[in-house]
């Protein structure tokens, strides 16, 4: 949405030149203000996903580790803010730079400037901490707190920003928005909101963390058979899932970063606002179909209607559609969600056979479904939407008649993300293990980190009247199966006195 004095002069006459300049400047200011408000609101929605991650993680672990996993989610956001401010944003979007890594804006120096204002930093920080939150789920219930500090800072300050520079910056070697050199296969990578940049990065990092640490005590029996260590609260899992669903409407539609932009002749549907709405619809359909497919797929597999499996299936659909949400039709999003559900089910079965333990299925969900989403986009991206967002003459989906160039670029993306994260996070986790800084002791793991590392339990119930009568201040929930009730504690206390 833009105008200029030359556009208005024929209407107002030559004597109105100053007036037209003034009006055009006001139009430009209004457009910038609306776009900034849209981006800030999207950033707030994406940040709200941290609450969803916290609730999802808390419900997926045993009660004795609840405080630990929630503290790591707070740490991801807080440490991520500092290190993304100091280094991460510069590595990701510092321009001018080379195709590999940015080299401006350290500590937000020289900000704001055209194209890079503080709202954009906040939006990108919310994405960076989402990747770190994914990884924390893979290594839950057995990782030392200092290891979280180290990996979170490294991931948000260096590993993730480099990948986002490749794919999203104007200088990145694989970016579809590249302005400083040739596009990869004449196309660049269309990873609109980060199936690869966010979800694969977090998932592959979690894969290496979980592999190097090994499974939790009791996860597999002496014969190698899988033993379910179920999370303690399906209610928290559902709450976290809905919060993440809500936040995804900032994650995917918000990745347009602006809303007042026209695509052609003036008209209600010829603008970016229509693309924003379509992106919200494709996101909704992919997640919903993935949830339903998982519901019936797991019912056939296990004989149960499992709400936790459905929630994970839903999130897998969201992770998959994130790459192509803006460039595919709603009917294609249904295919994306359907396939992503089976990708997750299959990878979970493979993980059990390989004795791979990921308490939140993060590597399978975000890594596996994210990779599928990258391939899906290369198959189903529609020419009209690609050209509206990225420019005319771009390759589009193979199944839509666009040839194989986009698919080739996306295969390269999957390979380089897996290789980069493996070469950076793998040695980091291995080094932490050799230094004795990665895994907690068997005694601490058995007792639970809330008690041994955080000074108490997550769930404490106090009843003042009961306390006055019995001298016992309530109960602490020690695990999903074991807790001390006030009445039982009072009876025990009376017996001891006798």
UniProtKB/Swiss-Prot annotation:
GO biological process, one term: ammonium transmembrane transport
Cellular-component GO terms for this entry: plasma membrane
Spans through the membrane: 39-59, 74-94, 120-140, 148-168, 192-212, 236-256, 274-296, 307-327, 331-351, 360-380, 411-431
InterPro entries the record matches: Ammonium/urea_transptr, Ammonium_transpt, Ammonium_transpt_CS, NH4_transpt_AmtB-like_dom
Subcellular location: Membrane
Entry protein name: Ammonium transporter 1 member 1
PANTHER family referenced in this protein's UniProt entry, alphabetically: AMMONIUM TRANSPORTER, AMMONIUM TRANSPORTER 1 MEMBER 1
């Amino acid at each position: 949405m833009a105008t200029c004095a030359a556009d208005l002069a024929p209407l107002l006459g030559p004597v109105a030149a100053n007036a037209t300049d003034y009006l055009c400047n006001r139009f430009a200011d209004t457009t910038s203000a609306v776009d900034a408000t849209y981006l800030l609101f999207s950033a707030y929605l994406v940040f709200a996903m941290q609450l969803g991650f916290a609730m999802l993680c808390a419900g997926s672990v045993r009660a004795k580790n609840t405080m630990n996993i929630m503290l790591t989610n707070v740490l991801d956001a807080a440490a991520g803010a500092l290190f993304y401010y100091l280094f991460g944003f510069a590595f990701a979007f510092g321009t001018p730079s080379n195709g590999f890594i940015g080299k401006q804006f350290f500590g937000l120096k020289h900000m704001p400037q055209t194209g890079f204002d503080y709202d954009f930093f906040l939006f990108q920080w919310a994405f960076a901490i989402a990747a770190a939150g994914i990884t924390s789920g893979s290594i839950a219930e057995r990782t030392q707190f200092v290891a979280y500090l180290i990996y979170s800072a490294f991931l948000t300050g260096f590993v993730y920003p480099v990948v986002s520079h490749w794919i999203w910056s104007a200088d990145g070697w694989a970016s579809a928005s590249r302005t400083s050199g040739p596009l990869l296969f004449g196309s660049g990578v269309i990873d609109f909101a980060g199936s690869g940049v966010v979800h694969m990065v977090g998932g592959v990092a979690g894969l290496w963390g979980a592999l190097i640490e090994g499974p939790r005590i009791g996860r597999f029996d002496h014969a190698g058979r899988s033993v379910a260590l179920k999370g303690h609260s399906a209610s928290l899992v559902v709450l976290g899932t809905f919060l993440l669903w809500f936040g995804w409407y900032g994650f995917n539609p918000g990745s347009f970063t602006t809303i007042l932009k026209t695509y052609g002749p003036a008209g209600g549907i010829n603008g970016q606002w229509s693309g924003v709405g379509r992106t919200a619809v494709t996101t909704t359909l992919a997640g919903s179909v993935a949830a339903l497919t998982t519901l019936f797929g797991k019912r056939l597999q296990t004989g149960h209607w499992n709400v936790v499996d459905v929630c994970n299936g839903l999130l897998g659909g969201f992770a998959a559609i994130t790459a192509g949400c803006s460039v595919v039709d709603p009917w294609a999003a249904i295919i994306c969600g359907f396939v992503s559900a089976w990708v997750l089910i299959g990878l979970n079965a493979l993980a059990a056979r390989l004795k791979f333990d990921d308490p939140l299925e993060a590597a399978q969900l975000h890594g596996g479904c994210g990779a599928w989403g990258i391939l899906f986009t290369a198959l189903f991206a529609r020419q009209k939407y690609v050209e509206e967002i990225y420019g005319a003459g771009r390759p589009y989906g193979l199944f839509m008649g666009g040839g194989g160039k986009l698919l080739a670029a996306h295969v390269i993306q999957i390979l380089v993300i897996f290789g980069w994260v493996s070469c950076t996070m793998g040695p980091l986790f291995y080094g932490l293990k050799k230094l004795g800084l990665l895994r907690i002791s068997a005694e601490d793991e058995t007792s639970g980190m809330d008690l041994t590392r955080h000074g108490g339990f997550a769930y404490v119930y106090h009843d003042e009247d009961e306390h006055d009568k019995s001298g016992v201040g309530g109960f602490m929930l020690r695990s999903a199966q074991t807790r001390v009730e006030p009445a039982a504690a009072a009876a025990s206390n009376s017996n001891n006195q006798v």
